[in-house]
Amino acid sequence: SIIKTGYAVHISRMSGSGRYLFVIGRDAKINMIDLWMEKPDNVAEIRVGLEARSVETSKYKGFEDKYAIAGSYWPPQYVIMNGDTLEPLKVVGTRGMTVDKQEYHPEPRVASIVASHFKPEFVVNVKETGQTLLVDYSNIDALKVTTIGTARFLHDGGLDSTKRYFMVA
């Protein structure tokens, strides 16, 4: 059967448990599909903006599927959600300075997001500013974000086969 999702699905990610498939359309609509149901279907959905490209779930031991995260092009932000319901818990803007010329950029888009298997962190790539953010979700009420300067306009990324290294182009 066909499961209705957002417009032009850009990426799909499996949850840490393998039970859920998260998809995000270019219209920023996230669908959480339960693959263990007799007939897989949507169990939660949310729209996190007007345009988006990336969704992921927490993978670190003890935090498997506890959180989901999505990054949007517009507005320039990422949203951390409850992994069971997609209820928004934190909305964090990405506006800021570029790494090379230290110029303010008002609309830096979140391109790719992956979840570390070694730490309670999301790796968030911010395209126009040339920043990769390590978002520590171990204390959702007091997020710790480490910013790594990279090249500007890096777009799509993922983990290598060991799941230790983030590669982005």
Regions found by a protein language model. Give the residues of each.
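Predominantly soluble domains enriched in secretory-pathway, periplasmic, or organellar proteins
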Residues: 1-169
